[in-house]
């Protein structure tokens, strides 16, 4: 079997999985609410900035941590956001599992 054909079959299977469909639906629902989506994107940007800063060896800014915690608390109470987080988690788990399978196959 051709490796590229297998990769395309895997891609198709992922797109047909419940985890992917739920994630795509949750993402679309979140994006349909402009103000909520803007708040969500702001949270994600701040979270990424904080992680990059911490990875470069800087201590986390306490004020920024507090802002992030409050934003997360507010966002997680919204049904669209909480469903997005759940769906994203399931989808990430699927991708992580597939990555582990591929990594095991590459062990020499």
Task: For every predicted segment, state its role.
Residues 1-108:
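Terminal, compositionally biased segments used for targeting/anchoring and flexible tails
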């Amino acid at each position: 079997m051709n490796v590229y054909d297998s990769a395309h079959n895997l891609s198709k299977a992922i797109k047909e999985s419940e985890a992917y469909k739920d994630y795509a639906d949750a993402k679309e629902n979140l994006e349909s609410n402009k103000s909520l989506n803007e708040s969500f994107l702001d949270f994600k940007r701040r979270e990424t900035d904080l992680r990059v800063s911490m990875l470069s060896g800087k201590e986390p800014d306490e004020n920024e941590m507090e802002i992030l915690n409050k934003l997360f608390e507010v966002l997680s109470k919204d049904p669209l956001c909480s469903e997005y987080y759940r769906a994203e988690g399931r989808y990430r788990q699927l991708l992580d599992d597939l990555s582990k399978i591929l990594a095991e196959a590459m062990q020499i």
